[in-house]
Design a protein with these regions (language model features):
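Positively charged, helix-rich recognition surfaces that bind polyanionic ligands
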Residues: 38, 46-172
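Acidic carboxylate diad motif detector
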Residues: 1-47
Length: 172
């Protein structure tokens, strides 16, 4: 992969347009980062069908909240990815569906077995298509889990919950 330190980023372009422009290669892209000084470096990582651009930057350390007596518990599962309950008065338990993840995996396994059977006839084990299929599956799963975790955090913030218990407790 290619690494560009903060000295190779055009400060003028960043201040005017909030875009990161890498000198020497003509790559320019929009960013949500507002402070130029916080940017450490930019990495360009080649993938199968695309390139991934990572902007490494510093953020302020978030101080942990003081425990206010409000807690939530999450039970992780397969059909129900997460079941959330809390001791907050009026809190309605929330279930985050896990079936879409099962569906993504089922579709992936079905397609992969089809392609593998075709490849075995040719004497090869992998192809560009199977790698692309695997990338697509990984991206879909990461997207769903990220959206689910973001939803959980917003529920916790909305109900002013400062402590979260996940999984099996030894005392239970």
């Amino acid at each position: 992969f290619l690494t560009f330190n903060n000295q190779t980023i055009s400060k003028k372009v960043f201040i005017k347009t909030n875009k990161i422009k890498l000198s020497g290669c003509g790559i320019e892209f929009l960013t949500k980062i507002t402070d130029f000084k916080s940017i450490n470096c930019v990495r360009i990582i080649p993938g199968l069908d695309q390139y991934t651009i990572e902007v490494i930057h510093e953020i302020e350390e978030v101080k942990p909240l003081k425990y206010n007596g409000n807690l939530a518990s999450i039970d992780l599962g397969v059909n129900n990815l997460a079941t959330i309950t809390s001791n907050v008065k009026g809190f309605r338990p929330v279930i985050i569906n896990g079936r879409p993840l099962k569906s993504i995996n089922q579709f992936f396994n079905k397609k992969l077995s089809y392609y593998k059977s075709k490849l075995e006839k040719n004497g090869t084990k992998s192809s560009h298509r199977t790698k692309r299929l695997n990338n697509k599956r990984t991206n879909k799963i990461n997207d769903y889990i990220h959206k689910s975790s973001k939803e959980i955090v917003s529920i916790l913030k909305k109900n002013d919950i400062t402590k979260l218990v996940i999984g099996q407790n030894k005392e239970w």
